[in-house]
Amino acid sequence: MAVSKITLHYAQTTGGSNEAAAAFPWNTPKKAVNPYLDPAEFAPESALSNLIALYAVDNEQEQLRRETLSDEVWERYFFNESRDPVQREMEQDRLISHAKTAREQQRFNPDLVIIANVGAQPAHISKPLLERIKYFHSLGRAKAYSRYLQKTIRPCLERLERVRDSQVSASFRFMASHDGLEGLLVLPEMNQDQVKRLSTLVAAHMSMCLDAACGDLFVSDDVKPEEIRQAWERVAAEAMRLEVIPPAFEQLRRKKRRRKPVPYELIPPSLARMLCADWWYRKLWQMRCEWREEQLRAVCLVNKKASPYVSYEAVIHKREQRRKSLEFFRSHELINEDGDTLDMEDVVNASNSNPAHRRNEMMACVKGLELIAEMRGDCAVFYTITCPSRFHATLNNGRPNPKWTSATVRQSSDYLVDTFAAFRKAMHKAGLRWYGVRVAEPHHDGTVHWHLLCFMRKKDRRSITALLRKFAIREDREELGANTGPRFKPELINPRKGTPTSYIAKYISKNIDGRGLAKEISKETGRSLRDSAEHVSAWASLHRVQQFRFFGIPGRQAYRELRLLAGQAARVQGERKAGAPVLDNPRLDAVLAAADAGCFATYIMKQGGVLVPRKHHLVRTAYELNDEPSAYGDHGIRIYGIWSPIAEGKICTHAVKWKKVRKAVDVQEAAADQGACAPWTRGNNCPPVENLNKSGGDLPDIKTMNEKELQDYLHNMGQKERRELTARLRLVKPKRKTVYKQNISEQQRLQLEAELTARGFEGSASEIDLLLRGGSIPSGAGLRIFYRNHRLQEDDKWRQ
């Protein structure tokens, strides 16, 4: 008890065991050595220590590089599935397992099969379809999404396979089996460069066929024309296997009852074309574009819900083609033997190639027919003829048409042409006659339908209408029932409601340039008729459809030549008396005067009237052979002028020979005028003002005036100067507000992104933000895309 008290007292006195232990010097705790916590313990730096550290780092990096290189070499040359059987077996097992898993998922979810099939298609098919599938998936409606895949996408893929089978025939596949011609099987997927290479290979194959035919047939030096024709037949047979009609095939082919001798002189130019790579490029590129367009029609990418009349790809290609043509016209000029020059762009714009001139001429012709009908007491009837449903690829709601038989746009046009030819033959046999104009235009899916403005005797109207209805509905009659309106629709024009010219004016304008139809909305597509004019023009160019055709009247080419002759005579005679005759024959001069005045009614009557055979017309177009041969050795036919059976000789309207040459451009002048837009050279492309300042010249003196002086200046301006100033002010685009931005929902944003992607843009967030802030994106040919009123629009005047 006493010891415990002493121990407790000692512990309380010394402050515990730790304090008691630290009281002795030999038991004092020592500080741990930690260079990270105590920088003072670091060894002093020296040049040697730094050099050693750098060497250590270099050695470490070199070791890592060697190890990496060793691993890459091992994996590339040894450890891969092609050399290591174990690795190859493991890779095969992995792929098989992945395929089984995907197959199992597709068995329980058939939608994945459809998506996989879409992804396996070429880019021009899969990209727009996947964008639409992505859009439907983003809506969050599972049943609607699955229904869209099953009811729309799967039938589209089935139709696509049928279209491909119809495009590639057995003979076409046989040609593709030759060495180097395998690309024929994927012709719709090629671009222009690939088609050019393929056309070179096809031309080489034709050359080898000709060499083989010559070796088999030409056994002696004395070659007969019939042997040359047999060699041509072999090369032509090879071309026919590619679905291409050889040149001069109708004149050179074998016929049982040939009335005229065989034109052997057509064989050399025909062979020259079939051995030319450029000729094959034009044929194959046309075939590629048509096949590609039909495939897009098969998957419902050409309709009013996607792209009306024709695909966006074809529209963009047409814009680019028009832009290149315009650049070509601007860079060339025409020159004659005397050295006179004409700007090629001005010549083209002054010709009938100008849409405005073409529209004005057709409207004047229709007006002339209207005046003649009033004079004769004829009635006017407006007919609409449509193809059967088997020619229509898409329904009105944008879904696949189950009755479509993979018929092409060209086949629908040929159907209407054949129907009209059969009707015309029956009409002439019945003693019925008519005259008028026919307009061919597309449905929203590209199928052709016709509008006819016909003038006839009132007593023949019912007979002609009944006969035309009989031929228009004779095929697939059971699908119409009692209502024949979807296939054939006649409408008697009431003069109280409008004239025949007013009926046809809209159809002529919307199929050329859409003049005056900016506010007219198409009932079929829901878009402005002026905006649809570009699609219609691209559709007619791609499918080679003749849009306008007049019948029962004299030719319009003679009308143009007479107007040209009248202008030439006015320039030669100078100050001649008004109404003075130009031609010696009064009857011919009367026809020329009517054409010069632009009165089609008088011109037609002076030519002999309507419903008169061509052999009885007074003035006709004269043709002649070209003086210089073409690149293929033949002399083409060109217009010489006019001729008449009641007068001797021909009248030449193209006496001056013009040649096409490239304009001479001064590079220094172009650089000084255009600044940074000039071609890249060693000179400085600064703006002209900066160049002037650097060269020591004086800056241009810009006159300023106060408000009173400005008012006086504007008050003293003439009417012409005011118009010019107003026109310049209209060209100034207003500044866009920086804070302006349209507010749209997420669904509208997704729809905008899908539309941009369908038109060939990226549809990125930056593009969408630019459009929402009031900006625009160039789409080619001077047009721009902008977003206004929650709708994507395209125009060349988007600011106005």
Curated annotation (Swiss-Prot):
Superkingdom field: Bacteria
Keywords: DNA replication, Endonuclease, Hydrolase, Nuclease
Active site per UniProt: 503 (o-(5'-phospho-dna)-tyrosine intermediate), 507 (o-(5'-phospho-dna)-tyrosine intermediate)
Database matches in InterPro entries: Replication_gene_A-like (IPR008766)
Catalytic EC class: hydrolase
Family: Belongs to the phage GPA family.
Coiled coil, from the record: none
Protein name, entry field: Probable replication endonuclease from prophage-like region
Pfam families to which the protein is assigned, alphabetical: Phage_GPA (PF05840)
GO molecular function, one term: endonuclease activity
Keyword Nuclease: yes
Entry's EC annotation: 3.1.-.-
Function statement: Possible endonuclease which induces a single-strand cut and initiates DNA replication.
GO BP, one annotated term: DNA replication
